[in-house]
Structures are given as C-alpha cells and as structure tokens.
A protein has these predicted regions:
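N-terminal intrinsically disordered, cationic/polar leader segments
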Residues: 2-133, 137-145, 149-180
Length: 180
C-alpha cells in the first residue's frame, strides 16, 4: 500500500486542472504544465480534490506514489513557483545575468557562459549569488545542477559553486610527515 498516493491533493482556487485521457494539464498564474499519467494509475477529480487510484501490483503502487508527488509539484509550481539560490565561493568568482544568458568567472582562463532553458529565469542580486526561479521543479533542479557542475565545491577550501543551503564537508590538509 502506498502511503504517499493515499493522500488526496488539494487544488487551490487559482489553479485549473484538466484531465484528458491519460494527460493531466495544470495551469495557474505562473504557467502551464502537463504530465502523461501511467497506464496502471488513474486520477479522479472531485471539486477541489484529486485522488489517485491504482492496482494491487507493486509496480502500480510505486507509480501511484510517484505520480501523486509529480502532480503535487506541478500544482505548487504553477501557483507559487520554485526558487533555487546558488553561491559562488572563491576569489574572483562572480556571475552576471543578461536575459537567458548567465556569464560566470570561475577561475578558468575564460568566462563560462550558460544559456538557461526557456521556463527558467535568473537574477543576480550580488556578484556571488545566482537566484534561479521557475514553475517547473524538474527543469529548475536540472539547470541548477548543470551550473553547479562547472565548478563543484571542493572540500579543502570550500571554493566553487554551491547551493545556498548546502553544507560542504571540510577536510584537513595533509600534514608533513614527522621525522622517521
């Protein structure tokens, strides 16, 4: 039995949900998202609640929990949106956003340029902080991970691109061997 899929999803007043065959479309003030519902799962809409119905097989129970989580993320995304904050830690590390292009100096001999997906917006409140926002949680996480991958934080000095809430496990530098 799936504990996640048993919980109904409440639909806010500002969100419109349309279920057509095996496609669910969710639209709100921030945008519109759609999702293909797996064959072993069905979604029923009753007023402002969505319930997930599924079979007895282990596969359909697992898909039901995943489907419920993804649809809930879609509803939150189109009503409130998601944000991720990245910090650039290191001497001379800075970022500048212009439209859909993010240009970063990360200690390489050349600036790193990253073009953001259409649904992801970027702001740089300071030179060492990048704020990404989107209504699509998956796309936002993918873009943030790709930016972080240019220079992941290293454990000795902590330099690199890190998430704002990420804690870097620090290591101690190797000590010179004492006289044998």
């Amino acid at each position: 039995m799936s504990r996640v899929a048993n919980n109904p999803i409440t639909i806010p007043d500002s969100v419109k949900v349309n279920i057509d065959n095996s496609i669910i479309k969710v639209s709100g003030s921030k945008g519109e998202l759609d999702f293909n519902i797996p064959n072993s799962v069905s979604i029923k809409q009753e007023e402002s609640l969505l319930t997930i119905e599924f079979g007895e097989s282990q596969n359909s129970v697992a898909l039901a929990g995943t489907t419920r989580a993804l649809v809930n993320n879609m509803i939150i995304g189109v009503s409130e949106g998601y944000t991720k904050t990245l910090q650039l830690v290191g001497v001379g590390y800075r970022a500048k956003a212009s439209g859909k292009l993010l240009e970063m100096n990360l200690g390489f001999s050349h600036p790193v340029k990253y073009t953001l997906p259409d649904d992801v917006n970027v702001e740089t409140p300071s030179q060492t902080e990048v704020v990404l926002s989107s209504h699509n949680k998956q796309l936002l996480g993918q873009a943030a991970a790709e930016i972080r991958a240019f220079r992941p934080p290293e454990p000795y000095k902590g330099k690199g691109v890190k998430y704002a809430d990420e804690v870097i496990k620090r290591k101690e530098a190797k000590k010179a061997a004492a006289g044998a």
